[in-house]
UniProtKB/Swiss-Prot annotation:
One of its GO terms (cellular component) is extracellular region. The gene is FGL3. This is Secreted mono- and diacylglycerol lipase 3. Its EC number is 3.1.1.-. Its main location: secreted.
């Protein structure tokens, strides 16, 4: 009887040993890429930033780099909307790791039309397609830039959602494109909210887009899904001025510029974040704009209307 009990115990012990070995092998097979780990100083995984910086950078490149089928990293360009001149370029990508990415181009410094959006500074009633509540107001130039492309963007996005129905959407942009990205996110939520989900909105070097009522409404619609990113002493996110305009909640500050020293500041206009800087729009003793930190290295990828690589490159900086 004791011999039989010993056999049972040995069999159980053998089963447990084999099971533990199998579990260990599975655990060891899990990728340990550092970019996929959550950085406690960022609201989203680092890889989401590194990849979407490249998504945006490619919108600054010429027509050849913005032909559907172009690939970089694990992203494939599906749709390129707008000519980057009279209509700000918006690209729609599919990423194997992140899903659908919608990225908007910043100001084209060689385009009078593109630059004109930056000075249409009157707050106006938002377009009904944004789905904002009464009392919200938005910067006229950003809404004008968004509106010119939205019909074509929404049609292309509808096709993309049909092609990848289980994928979520990340919306992103830089500078003027960052402002457009907030409006694009609202329009996507309003038009496609019943068939798709916005995962994140990441706005690089974002100017303020709307009034405090706009910022509050945006926070309500996208709780915990948004962050702006400010590089060093970039002054663009400090405009247009408060109290008429206000950022939604959440801002990452890369400080010093182009470094791996960054921190997330929750809430609207956190006084410990980029709002604590004294901005310098011009080079000392001149009226020449200092665009320095507006372009540069964001989370290991390079981006800027004149400085970034073409075609875009994911990481490596």
């Amino acid at each position: 009887m004791m011999f039989a009990d010993d056999l049972v115990r040995m069999a159980v012990l053998r089963f447990i040993t084999v099971a533990l070995a199998a579990i260990t092998n599975v655990a060891n097979a899990v990728p340990t890429d550092a970019t996929k780990r959550q950085d406690s100083n960022l609201p989203f995984p680092l890889a989401h930033f590194t990849n979407t910086v490249a998504s945006v950078q490619n919108t600054y490149c010429g027509p050849t780099a913005n032909t559907p089928g172009v690939k970089f990293g694990d992203q494939t360009l599906l749709h390129a909307i707008g000519d980057g001149d009279t209509v700000q370029r918006t690209n729609i990508y599919h990423s194997e790791s992140l899903g659908i990415i919608v990225a908007s181009q910043g100001t084209n410094l060689s385009s009078i039309v593109s630059q004109s959006h930056n000075i249409q500074a009157i707050p106006i009633i938002p377009d009904a397609r944004l789905g904002l509540p009464f009392g919200s107001m938005v910067f006229a130039g950003w809404q004008n830039a968004w509106s010119k492309g939205w019909t074509d963007v929404s049609a292309a996005l509808a096709d993309t959602i049909k092609q990848f129905p289980n994928d979520q959407i990340i919306v992103t942009g830089h500078s003027q494109g960052a402002a457009i990205s907030l409006l694009t996110a609202l329009a996507i939520q309003n038009q496609f909210g019943n068939v798709s989900t916005i995962r994140e909105i990441i706005a690089y070097g974002p100017p303020r887009v709307g009034t405090p009522a706009f910022a509050d409404a945006f926070d309500t619609i996208f709780p915990g899904k948004y962050t702006g990113v400010v590089n060093g002493d970039d002054w663009v996110p400090s405009l247009p001025s408060q109290p008429i305009y206000r950022h939604p909640s959440g801002m990452v500050w890369i400080n010093p510029a182009n470094s791996t020293s960054w921190k997330y500041y929750p809430g609207q206009e956190n006084p410990d974040g980029p709002d604590s800087r004294v901005i310098q729009m011009f080079y000392p003793g001149t009226l020449q704009f200092n665009w320095g930190d507006h372009q540069g290295i964001y989370m290991h990828s390079s981006m800027g209307t004149t400085q970034g690589p073409c075609p875009a490159q994911v990481g490596g900086f």
